[in-house]
């Protein structure tokens, strides 16, 4: 590639990453649209990721063999599947801004998992990331009006603890933890072919979300998918194309930018999610949420700017 071509490719790389962040940051809207047409987010995730798997297998058939014959990638299937099933479900049933912020506790989990799985040393900077994430989560999760209630004895100390209380909160936290597992496993399996890792992540979304959808449908907790109809099929196919395109954009951008710059650009997902949610009625921004969110994003930014990344 010529110097001019390399410079042009480098210039497009940040735009590709911003596109990826935009797709994921605004994905809550089509997911809620599909929910309104009777398609639960778990069924949506399973169908979208299954279509993506078939597409990858058709374009890169070697990826299928790599996945089937590499047990190490099976853990990636589980981690990626839990990430997408939890996150997509959470942003449909919960406040989008709150869910995305809880999801971005990921740097906190990454520090702990990198220590346990990769044997990485816990540095002062890493400890600061944990402290920022923990403080931010405590502020976001602190129950409304509970501070004065504790002093008056109206509620117990346990009831006033800043812990997830709704299903959406728990799914946001679980999604972020699973994404941290996903990232640690990707680092551990960095020598594996890229198409095998990509297929593993898409297969995880299809398998985990599909299994949960089947189990909850059998239990009567989730409605079965509606009959084929243009209003939701068109959106489903469009969402599949968007997710595949965003994955390609992520690979393009991440391959051409340093990891720290990639991580910083990817934080724009929080901006896209927050602005779209506030504009379209998917969430609300309170002062407490803004303060807690600033600490959580600060921890993520500190992780992104860590030397040597």
Question: Each predicted region: which residue ranges?
Answer:
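Transmembrane alpha-helical segments that form core, pore/gating elements
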Residues: 17, 21, 25-33, 56, ...
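C-terminal-most transmembrane helix of multi-pass membrane proteins
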Residues: 2, 142-143, 263, 267-309
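Loop-to-transmembrane-helix transition segments
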Residues: 12-20, 63-86, 166-175, 223-245, ...
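Specific transmembrane alpha-helical segments of multi-pass solute transporters/efflux pumps
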Residues: 26, 63-98, 103, 139-140, ...
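Hydrophobic transmembrane alpha-helices of multi-pass small-molecule transport proteins
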Residues: 56, 125-144, 150-156, 288-307
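Transmembrane alpha-helices of multi-pass small-molecule transport proteins
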Residues: 12-13, 23, 37-82, 109, ...
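Helix-helix packing/entry segments at the starts of transmembrane helices
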Residues: 100-105, 189-205, 243-279
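C-terminal transmembrane-helix exit sites in multi-pass transporters
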Residues: 60-62, 106-128, 271-291
């Amino acid at each position: 590639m010529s110097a001019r071509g390399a410079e042009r490719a480098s210039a497009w790389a940040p735009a590709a990453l911003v596109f990826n962040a935009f797709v994921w940051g605004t994905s809550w809207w089509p997911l809620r649209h599909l929910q309104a047409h009777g398609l639960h987010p778990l069924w949506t995730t399973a169908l979208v990721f299954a279509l993506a798997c078939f597409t990858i297998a058709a374009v890169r058939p070697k990826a299928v063999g790599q996945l089937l014959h590499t047990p190490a990638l099976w853990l990636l299937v589980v981690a990626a599947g839990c990430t997408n099933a939890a996150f997509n479900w959470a942003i449909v049933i919960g406040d989008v801004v709150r869910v995305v912020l809880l999801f971005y506790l990921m740097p906190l989990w990454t520090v702990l998992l990198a220590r346990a799985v990769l044997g990485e040393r816990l540095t002062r900077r890493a400890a600061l990331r944990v402290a920022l994430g923990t403080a931010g989560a405590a502020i976001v999760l602190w129950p409304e009006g509970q501070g004065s209630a504790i002093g008056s004895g109206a509620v117990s100390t346990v009831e006033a603890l800043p812990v997830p209380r709704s299903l959406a909160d728990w799914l946001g936290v679980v999604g972020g933890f699973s994404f941290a597992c996903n990232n640690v496993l990707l680092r551990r399996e960095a020598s594996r072919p890229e198409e095998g890792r990509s297929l593993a992540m898409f297969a995880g979304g299809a398998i985990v979300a599909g299994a949960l959808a089947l189990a909850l449908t059998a239990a009567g907790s989730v409605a079965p998918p509606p009959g084929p109809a243009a209003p939701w099929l068109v959106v489903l196919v469009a969402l599949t194309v968007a997710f595949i395109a965003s994955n390609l954009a992520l690979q393009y951008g991440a391959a051409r930018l340093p990891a720290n710059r990639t991580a910083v650009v990817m934080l724009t997902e929080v901006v896209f999610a927050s602005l779209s949610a506030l504009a379209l009625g998917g969430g609300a921004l309170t002062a407490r949420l803004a303060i807690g969110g600033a600490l959580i994003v600060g921890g993520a930014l500190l992780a992104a700017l860590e030397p040597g990344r």
